[in-house]
Amino acid sequence: MTTRKKKRAAPAGNDGFSLISNEKLIALYAAMLRCRMLDERIRALAGPGRSAFGRGHEAAVVAATIDLLPKDAISPPRGGLTPCLVKGVRLKTIFTWLRAQPDALPARYALRGIIAPGADIATQLKAALRAAQLARATKSKNLVVVFANCAQLTRGVGLEFLRIAAAERLPILFVCHARSSKEDFAPKARDYGLPGITVDGDDVVAVYRVVSEAITHARRGNWPTFIECKPWTVGDRKKRGAGSALNNMEAYLSRKGLFSTKLKTDLTARFTRELDKVSQL
């Protein structure tokens, strides 16, 4: 099996050279901005203990979700509302879920391609694997994207689910977050038969390229993929910060002549109006 190495975004020129259109690049940025704003609104309304699972993870959430098809499924962790937003769930529905009890949601989630979060990682993974097994059995070419913490996936019961996914060649992507650049979880996934790729978790372009390749393989029935999104270190300097994914993308778009203050202002104003309409608790 081919060993997967760390990936960073390659330099990109205009549409053809980067293989990612300018329209898609702006869409990635806009989706990250919406995820950040949703998380901030939820924190403001429901308190700091309640978030949308997006703060610091916008690049991975957006890159792994933005190109999914309607019948693909995502498996967010408990409280994981930003992946649902990118998947296409309406804001009104998201705030309805926010007010509800988690165990009252499975049917509503399933109708929108959302696998209801479980009480623990084992419950979450069991439901995700069941959905992936169904997709493979019916040859539907649908896939499942699991969002989780790297440590949870690469120890104890998580390793058993990785082994099953690899053995059955299930159409599933495990998108996980490492809290430190010193952590290295992808080799553990490779030990269990999955291609493991490490990518800069604050670089949405890099994550998008990795995810796009993984999605292609999953739809072809080749193999599942373990994608480790982690803080990147350049020499002794860590590139981590509360807004680094958004800041990085703004800098990237600026280099391509695609970013302006007006773009950000317009996107922010538009989504603020949408939030104001539905977020009264």
Q: Predicted segment positions?
A:
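Cofactor-binding active-site loop characterized by glycine-rich and histidine/acidic residues
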Residues: M37-A167, A186, D191-G193
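Glycine-rich ThDP/TPP pyrophosphate-binding loop and its adjacent helix/strand module
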Residues: A116-Q280
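Conserved acidic/glycine
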Residues: M1-V61, I66-P70, V234-L281
